[in-house]
């Protein structure tokens, strides 16, 4: 599902959600009929007086009071996933609410400010606002999964619990067309995720823009050396912030012979396939080839504040030997300087 939005008269934010082809009913309901709803009530099984019944509980239907839709009320659309775009954040979904947990206060403050900026940028009205709580006005969603325009209102809050910082989005009011209705569990879960993803996307875009600017303004070379992580294990240390180094990876690693396959900035992982560069490359940089067998490897990047740790694991998830990491240090340092010099020459 894709997001787009348009602004209409009256500062009303309208979000357009596009989906697959077919009518809204076809996308929300099961394809077959609902004759099972006409099934008559079960009657008590009558046994002859001299019969000795044997009961097996394996297939007993649990007794109890169960609530939920049936037939056409059952929404078959897959759950809306929350995008993991904030490094270090953990997402918790409970009773349809979405909570982001962060360890550092400055990260939580940035997420909060991102949400405030996103509401302003997208012309979402605010009914009430305090230091830690926001109640929005109606947000209109135009979705191909719905027959009418959908309106929703949210409460957004931030708080602390168990030495962590929480950021929560909760759908509080629901409207279909001009008619207000109770908030269903399905809609609460789905449209909480939609608004959370808008905040996530804005945070990610801001972070990328900031990192790109820092990378452009960085004039001194990146010192790279061997060191150890917080657990004392040997790692490569790049003396530059994580976000700055991340922006340069698509240039650095391919130059060394690594073809990028997967990247996940929030988890700090890059999966790449290695094929040793030719002799000309090693002669040009004046270093011995690294003793690394061709294959798939995963780079693990850790945020150490103004530094970044780098480790490498093989296809089985086993860390490569310390000696191999040491042999990669001068190569990585040379390539970092070389790619930076080429970028500066191009800008001039």
Swiss-Prot record:
Part of the Bam complex. InterPro entries: BamC, BamC_C, NlpB/DapX. It is a lipid-anchor. It comes from the Bacteria. This is Outer membrane protein assembly factor BamC. Residues 1-19 form the signal peptide. NCBIfam families: PRK11679.1. A lipid is attached at residue 20 (N-palmitoyl cysteine). It is found in: Cell outer membrane. Its main location: membrane. The keyword Ribonucleoprotein does not apply. One of its GO terms (biological process) is protein insertion into membrane. A lipid is attached at residue 20 (S-diacylglycerol cysteine). It holds the Pfam family Lipoprotein_18. Part of the outer membrane protein assembly complex, which is involved in assembly and insertion of beta-barrel proteins into the outer membrane.
């Amino acid at each position: 599902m894709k997001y787009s939005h348009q602004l209409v008269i009256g500062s009303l934010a309208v979000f357009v959600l596009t989906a697959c082809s077919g009518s809204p009913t076809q996308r929300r309901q099961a394809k077959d009929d609902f004759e099972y709803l006409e099934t008559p009530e079960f009657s008590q099984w009558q046994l002859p007086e001299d019969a000795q019944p044997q009961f097996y509980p394996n297939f007993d239907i649990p007794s109890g009071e169960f609530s939920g839709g049936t037939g056409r009320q059952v929404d078959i659309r897959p759950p809306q996933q929350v995008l993991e775009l904030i490094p270090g954040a953990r997402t918790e979904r409970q009773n349809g609410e979405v909570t982001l947990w962060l360890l550092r206060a400055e990260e939580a403050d940035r997420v909060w400010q991102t949400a405030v900026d996103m509401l302003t940028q997208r012309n979402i009205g605010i009914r009430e606002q305090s230091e830690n709580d926001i109640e929005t006005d109606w947000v209109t969603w135009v979705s191909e999964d719905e027959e009418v325009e959908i309106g929703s209102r949210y409460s957004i809050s931030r708080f602390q619990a168990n030495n962590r910082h929480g950021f929560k989005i909760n759908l509080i009011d629901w409207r279909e067309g001009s008619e207000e209705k109770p908030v269903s569990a399905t809609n609460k879960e789905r449209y909480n995720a939609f608004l959370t993803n808008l905040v996530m996307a804005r945070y990610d875009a801001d972070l990328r823009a900031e990192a790109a600017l820092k990378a452009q303004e960085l004039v001194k070379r990146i010192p790279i050396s061997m060191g150890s992580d917080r657990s004392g294990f040997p790692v490569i240390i790049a003396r530059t912030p994580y976000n700055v180094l991340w922006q340069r990876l698509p240039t650095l690693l391919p130059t060394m012979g690594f073809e990028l396959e997967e990247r996940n900035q929030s988890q700090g992982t890059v999966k790449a396939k290695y094929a040793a560069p030719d002799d000309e490359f090693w002669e040009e940089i004046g270093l011995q080839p690294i003793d690394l067998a061709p294959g798939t490897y995963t780079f693990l990047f850790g945020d150490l504040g103004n530094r970044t740790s780098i480790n490498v694991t093989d296809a089985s998830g086993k860390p490569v030997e310390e000696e191999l990491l040491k042999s990669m240090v001068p190569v990585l340092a040379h390539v970092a300087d070389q790619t930076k010099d080429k970028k500066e020459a191009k800008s001039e």
